[in-house]
């Protein structure tokens, strides 16, 4: 039996929600280990549809514990709002199905305001932040001035911590020509929400270690995608946290040996939201067709996603940087009916051939994809639940992707419905 880490193998929006929901049926605990409420996913459980941004997928499933780890930056008001929204759908979130790391960093209103100021006022190309305060909160965490969840339980210790926080932020606000924030305002903001979120706090690393030793199955749920990793992604058009699989250990407090199987999620094509390099992006009718058939709009932002052909180079990079054991390939049905399908196998940069995307931003902008053309299929893959249901050419496409990325396809998703999944290898049985 293996614990399983699920990571996006592209730029996010790969369909992790469905796969995590499918796997969470076998898990005892589902753990969020990085990011915040800046990336959402949709879960379909029976007739109910849940849209989550911060809560782990396990909270909507009976007898499963959801855990928010220390690697997450937590907006306490967003957490309370999401809990209330689920209550309206008949899902009660209590300490029985949710625990939050006591050392998780909090996102405050000043973080959201600073995030928006920087994005809206930045000269040149924008990073594409969701303006939810994620980046500024991580900055304060690294700068050792953050307010953490456990601090709300010790209100007498808050004033000096707030003073240290505001010494930094008010200096920034003066630079922006903004009114300074009072310590009382931050204290009131924290005091007003404390009773809503403190009941969930726990020493998460200890809880997870005991669960692991007790033979519990743990599913680590990544947000966004590995190509948005602050170190290994297309910097600076990335998120503010590490999104590769190794972060599951750091962001939960479990040692790396506790991670067994790494499952990467990848679409059968490629999408990206916001700015940044995208070598295989299609600006023609084919890209439009993929976007329309795939319903490519962001769960959280509603922004239209950019669409392009499958980039085997980038997914292969993720296989290597995340140590991916197998891939869940999603949205294969979107490619039904194409006469031919193209796959990027290399890049040409100034006449030189590359099998990976260089870290240089300038080189990324000059990268021209080198394509391999694969015949399409006229039949349908939508709703297929076994290999026998797939057109022969669709199977050849999947097999070629396996060869190019250096990892097997463990699961194949053929529609948004959770049961429309072809299982080749169960990650929990590794």
Swiss-Prot record:
It is an enzyme of class 6 (ligase). Mg(2+) binds at residues 13, 40. Its main location: cytoplasm. SUPFAM superfamilies: P-loop containing nucleoside triphosphate hydrolases (SSF52540). GO terms for cellular component: cytoplasm. Pathway: Purine metabolism; AMP biosynthesis via de novo pathway; AMP from IMP: step 1/2. Homodimer. Plays an important role in the de novo pathway of purine nucleotide biosynthesis. Catalyzes the first committed step in the biosynthesis of AMP from IMP. This is Adenylosuccinate synthetase. It comes from Methylorubrum populi (strain ATCC BAA-705 / NCIMB 13946 / BJ001). The lineage of its organism: Bacteria, Pseudomonadati, Pseudomonadota, Alphaproteobacteria, Hyphomicrobiales. The gene is purA.
């Amino acid at each position: 039996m293996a614990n399983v880490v699920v990571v996006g193998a592209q730029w996010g929006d790969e369909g992790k929600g469905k796969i995590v929901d499918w796997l969470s049926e076998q898990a005892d605990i589902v753990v969020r280990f990085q990011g915040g409420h800046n990336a959402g996913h949709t879960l379909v459980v029976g007739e109910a549809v849940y849209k989550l941004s911060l809560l782990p997928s396990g909270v909507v499933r009976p007898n499963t514990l959801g855990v928010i780890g220390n690697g997450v930056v937590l907006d306490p008001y967003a957490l309370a709002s999401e809990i209330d929204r689920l209550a309206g759908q008949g899902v009660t979130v209590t300490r029985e199905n949710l625990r939050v790391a006591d050392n998780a960093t909090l996102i405050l209103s000043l973080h959201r305001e600073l995030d928006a100021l920087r994005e809206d006022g930045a000269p040149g190309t924008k990073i594409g932040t969701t303006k939810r305060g994620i980046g500024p909160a991580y900055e304060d965490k690294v700068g050792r001035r953050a307010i953490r969840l456990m601090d709300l339980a010790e209100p007498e210790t808050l004033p000096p911590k707030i003073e240290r926080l505001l010494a930094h932020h008010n200096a920034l606000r003066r630079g922006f020509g903004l009114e300074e924030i009072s310590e009382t305002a931050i204290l009131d903001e924290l005091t007003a929400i404390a009773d809503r979120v403190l009941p969930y706090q726990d020493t998460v690393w200890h809880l997870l270690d005991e669960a692991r030793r007790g033979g519990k199955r743990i599913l680590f749920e990544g947000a966004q995608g590995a190509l948005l990793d602050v170190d290994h992604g297309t910097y600076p058009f990335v998120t503010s946290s590490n999104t590769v699989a190794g972060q599951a250990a750091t962001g939960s407090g479990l040692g790396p040996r506790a991670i067994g199987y790494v499952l990467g999620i990848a679409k059968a094509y490629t999408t990206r939201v916001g700015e940044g390099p995208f070598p295989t992006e299609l600006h023609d009718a084919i890209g439009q067709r993929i976007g329309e058939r795939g319903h490519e709009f962001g769960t959280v932002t509603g922004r239209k996603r950019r669409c392009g052909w499958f980039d085997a180079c980038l997914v292969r990079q993720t296989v290597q940087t995340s140590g991916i054991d197998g891939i869940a390939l999603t949205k294969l049905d979107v490619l039904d009916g194409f006469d031919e399908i193209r796959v990027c196998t290399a890049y040409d940069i100034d006449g030189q051939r590359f099998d990976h995307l260089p870290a240089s931003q300038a080189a990324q902008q000059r990268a021209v994809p080198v394509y391999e053309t694969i015949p399409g299929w006229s039949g349908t893959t939508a709703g297929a639940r076994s290999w026998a249901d797939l057109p022969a050419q669709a199977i050849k496409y999947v097999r070629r992707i396996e060869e190019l990325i250096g990892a097997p396809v463990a699961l194949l998703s053929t529609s948004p419905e959770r049961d429309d999944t072809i299982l080749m290898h169960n990650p929990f049985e590794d």
